[in-house]
């Protein structure tokens, strides 16, 4: 059902990359794991903004995937966006966050499964954008701890009762946390609606 609200298209160099898009307004670019489809979390985010989802399908290394996704985003005429990387898409998101030409606001990494490979530790420390790393309490990985230790402006949060597929298992939680972080960064833990800390 979620897939029905997303339009599909192709963008970028050569034959382009497939993507799914829904909503309007400020843009969130999501890079999801191998062959994934948009989840209810993406649909919820699309209720208050434009969401473009790229899947890590045969895009090569995370570095190459980031380059191609960056070209596709530029071809779509998007100048500024927030970025979300989920699962194996987190590494590509961090490579994209390194691109000097990309005007990226904040970055959310949901259950990252790998580190950046060839990117040296110093390159992590040069990322000045706010980054939030989310880890499910039922599927923690060492990658989240590594991102936390290297990124200068990194926040970390557990999502309870979630494993490695936070967007599928806890879509409301992922959408709420990501939206709050994109909009409020350091103040995101306190909801504007009721002033309560997110559980």
Question: Predicted regions span which residues?
Answer:
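Conserved HGGG/HGGXW glycine-rich cap/lid loop of the alpha/beta-hydrolase fold
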Residues: 13-60
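Catalytic active-site module of serine/aspartate enzymes centered on a nucleophile-bearing elbow/loop
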Residues: 154-199
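Short beta-to-alpha linker loops that shape the active-site pocket of alpha/beta-hydrolase fold enzymes
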Residues: 55-59, 113, 162-163
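Conserved acidic catalytic loop of the alpha/beta-hydrolase fold
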Residues: 64-81
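Conserved hydrolase catalytic core segment
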Residues: 79-115
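N-terminal cap/lid segment of alpha/beta-hydrolase-fold proteins
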Residues: 1-16
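Active-site nucleophile elbow and catalytic-triad environment of alpha/beta-hydrolase enzymes
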Residues: 113-123, 138-142
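Conserved loop-alpha-helix segment in the C-terminal half of the alpha/beta-hydrolase fold
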Residues: 43, 132-162
């Amino acid at each position: 059902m979620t897939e029905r609200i997303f339009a599909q298209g192709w963008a970028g160099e050569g034959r382009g990359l497939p993507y799914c898009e829904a909503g309007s307004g400020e843009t969130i670019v999501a890079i999801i794991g191998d062959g994934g489809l948009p989840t209810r979390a993406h649909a919820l985010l699309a209720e208050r903004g434009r969401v473009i989802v790229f899947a890590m399908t045969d895009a090569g290394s995370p570095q190459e995937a980031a380059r191609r996704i960056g070209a596709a985003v530029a071809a779509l005429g998007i100048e500024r966006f927030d970025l979300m990387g989920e699962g194996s898409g987190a590494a590509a998101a961090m490579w994209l966050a390194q691109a000097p030409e990309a005007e990226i606001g904040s970055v959310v990494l949901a259950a990252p499964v790998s580190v950046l490979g060839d990117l040296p530790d110093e390159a992590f420390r040069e990322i000045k954008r706010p980054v939030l790393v989310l880890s499910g309490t039922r599927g923690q990985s060492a990658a989240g701890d590594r991102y936390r230790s290297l990124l200068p402006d990194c926040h970390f949060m557990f999502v309870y009762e979630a494993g490695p597929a936070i967007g599928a298992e806890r879509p409301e939680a992922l959408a709420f946390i990501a939206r709050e972080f994109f909009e409020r960064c350091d103040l995101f833990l306190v909801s504007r609606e009721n002033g309560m800390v997110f559980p």
